[in-house]
């Protein structure tokens, strides 16, 4: 749970800083002193997600060897590949998402960019919605997502089965987060024994 005291806002969803810290720790353990090239989409979320991971990674000894931001709905990533190769990274971090990920990963595989480089990225980069379209080009990709359908617990297995029965697809990170918000609110109401806003807010602060 994350909280912004000034506004009284609480959230059950993972934040870029949390996910970046976990992913940066993994990179530090597997690629000590990593040479990282950053490639993101050119808008606020893309840039802020890159910045969050960059700060976490450099805090653990990684070094930046380049940074590029592509326009949204970019069709051709090959013009960026020369600069990526020149940087000689052993890790590429990307915050590209959606259909852009399909094109990026397919083109990185086609041009041999991802053959000898570890590709890591934001939680929304490879999801259940675009994984089939990306196919084998997604193999080896690592992210710091806060949810997976593969979590081995009775609660998650029950959730995945119920979600799939209702929606005909597995839950992704956003489906799990949405469920988490409702479950969190329900638990707070039960703890407060009330739906009064102030009482529920107070109960939320103590929930684990």
Regions flagged by a language model, labelled:
Residues 1-208:
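Extracytosolic ligand-binding ectodomains
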């Amino acid at each position: 749970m994350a909280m912004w005291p000034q506004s009284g806002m609480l959230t059950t969803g993972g934040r870029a800083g949390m996910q970046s810290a976990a992913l940066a720790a993994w990179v530090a353990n597997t690629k000590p002193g990593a040479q990282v090239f950053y490639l993101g989409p050119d808008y606020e979320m893309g840039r802020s997600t890159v910045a969050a991971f960059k700060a976490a990674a450099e805090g653990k000894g990684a070094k930046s060897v380049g940074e590029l931001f592509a326009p949204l709905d970019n069709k051709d990533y090959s013009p960026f590949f020369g600069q990526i190769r020149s940087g000689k990274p052993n890790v590429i971090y990307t915050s590209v998402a959606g259909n852009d990920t399909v094109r990026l990963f397919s083109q990185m595989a086609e041009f041999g960019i991802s053959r000898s480089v570890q590709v890591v990225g934001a939680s929304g980069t490879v999801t259940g919605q675009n994984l089939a379209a990306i196919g084998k080009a997604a193999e080896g990709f690592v992210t710091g997502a806060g949810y997976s359908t593969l979590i081995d617990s009775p609660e998650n297995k029950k959730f995945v089965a119920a979600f799939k029965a209702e929606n005909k697809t597995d839950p992704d990170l956003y489906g799990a987060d949405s469920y988490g918000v409702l479950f969190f609110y329900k638990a707070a109401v039960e703890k407060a024994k009330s739906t009064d806003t102030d009482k529920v807010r107070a109960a939320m602060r103590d929930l684990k």
